[in-house]
């Protein structure tokens, strides 16, 4: 890909530049956590239909407006609702989790959804 193509987004997309999205699962005013998680699934499906390579989920705790505290659970839910997009954690905060539990959870997810699960650590 030449320098000219790097400056042209349309050209870059046609050259298969991998794009990813980071989902915070923000709860909008008036929505429930369930609605927010359903929106996250719809967002991932839409990203997949547009050819995005990866869908990252952020981990946040003790925040009423963010519904992605149980990242591995949400990753499994979204991977099960999509077909090909990679799904991963945009930073599992290891000080908050026993490392063995994280390894087992993500190993299980990888077994269920081969070559589609990514583990980001923070």
Where are these regions (language model features)?
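N-terminal beta1-alpha1-beta2 module of alpha/beta enzyme domains
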Residues: 4-87
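Structural motif
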Residues: 58, 90, 120-122
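Generic structural signal for well-ordered secondary structure
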Residues: 67-71, 95, 102
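Glycine-rich, flexible loop/turn motifs
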Residues: 81, 90, 108
């Amino acid at each position: 890909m030449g320098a000219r193509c790097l400056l042209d987004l349309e050209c870059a997309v046609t050259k298969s530049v991998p794009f990813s999205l980071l989902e915070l699962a923000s709860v909008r005013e008036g929505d429930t956590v369930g609605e927010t998680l359903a929106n996250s699934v719809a967002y991932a499906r839409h990203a997949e239909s547009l050819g995005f390579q990866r869908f990252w989920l952020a981990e946040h705790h003790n925040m009423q407006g963010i519904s992605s505290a149980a990242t591995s659970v949400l990753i499994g839910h979204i991977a099960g609702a999509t077909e090909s997009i990679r799904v991963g954690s945009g930073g599992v905060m290891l000080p908050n989790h026993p490392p063995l539990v994280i390894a087992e959870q993500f190993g299980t997810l990888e077994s269920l959804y081969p070559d589609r699960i990514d583990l980001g650590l923070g």
